[in-house]
Amino acid sequence: MNALLTNPFKERLRKGEVQIGLWLSSTTAYMAEIAATSGYDWLLIDGEHAPNTIQDLYHQLQAVAPYASHPVIRPVEGSKPLIKQVLDIGAQTLLIPMVDTADQARQVVSATRYPPYGERGVGASVARAARWGRIENYMAQVNDSLCLLVQVESKTALDNLDEILDVEGIDGVFIGPADLSASLGYPDNAGHPEVQRIIETSIRRIRAAGKAAGFLAVAPDMAQQCLAWGANFVAVGVDTMLYSDALDQRLAMFKSGKNGPRVKGSY
């Protein structure tokens, strides 16, 4: 199979185009496929806070493959063995949580690259990513099609942001508002003015460095604000939260004493 590996999501980010996404926490291929038919530019399949196994992630990648929505996998952490597995099952774009230093960022980059450029274990002939060895020259061309995004979500990470942005192989930086606000001393209050100021400044620094800037905003007005600040890959909802809101709203139409969905300002 003489196939050329491409990553349209990465190319659009490189051009500075805005990409609107949805967070998937439901852990099922069925729900992932429903989301893929909605037309979001990207879908974050969450392996950090949602109870996804490697097989769950694999099945969700299969489910969304026929559609235009680009899957992004967030593993529970950025270890070399786990990154190897996620890449082998066919993920082209990764979002790595809790990256606090440039050294961590370099280790993550190395874990995604085959030798001599990194430390990714070689197993293309048994991997979905290489169509079980049928994609010719997979190892030679895969680096250009990988998109690596890292999460900055602590005061330490903010202090090291410029150094992280200088790491070759990092395509974008995602601001994690929930953990960041807690780290700054404002737990469960990403809307605090000081947190908002830091988010705005960070987004602008990321874009000024030539990297893509990402954010998850479950409140539409916050999503619009981040877009105005320059964020260009923004998730505007979480499937499980949207589902629970819809259930509450429908029940409130028929049962007295029900007030509809509760207001959720953060993830």
Swiss-Prot record:
It catalyses: 2-dehydro-3-deoxy-L-rhamnonate = (S)-lactaldehyde + pyruvate. The record marks 88 as: Increases basicity of active site His. Its cofactor is Mg(2+). The record marks 74 as: Transition state stabilizer. Its EC number is 4.1.2.53. Keywords: Lyase, Magnesium, Metal-binding. It comes from the Bacteria. The keyword Lyase applies. The keyword Iron does not apply. One of its GO terms (molecular function) is 2-keto-3-deoxy-L-rhamnonate aldolase activity. The active site is at residue 49. One of its GO terms (cellular component) is cytoplasm. Binds 1 Mg(2+) ion per subunit. Mg(2+) binds at residues 153, 179. Homohexamer. Belongs to the HpcH/HpaI aldolase family. KDR aldolase subfamily. Catalyzes the reversible retro-aldol cleavage of 2-keto-3-deoxy-L-rhamnonate (KDR) to pyruvate and lactaldehyde. HAMAP family: KDR_aldolase. This is 2-keto-3-deoxy-L-rhamnonate aldolase. It comes from Escherichia coli O1:K1 / APEC.
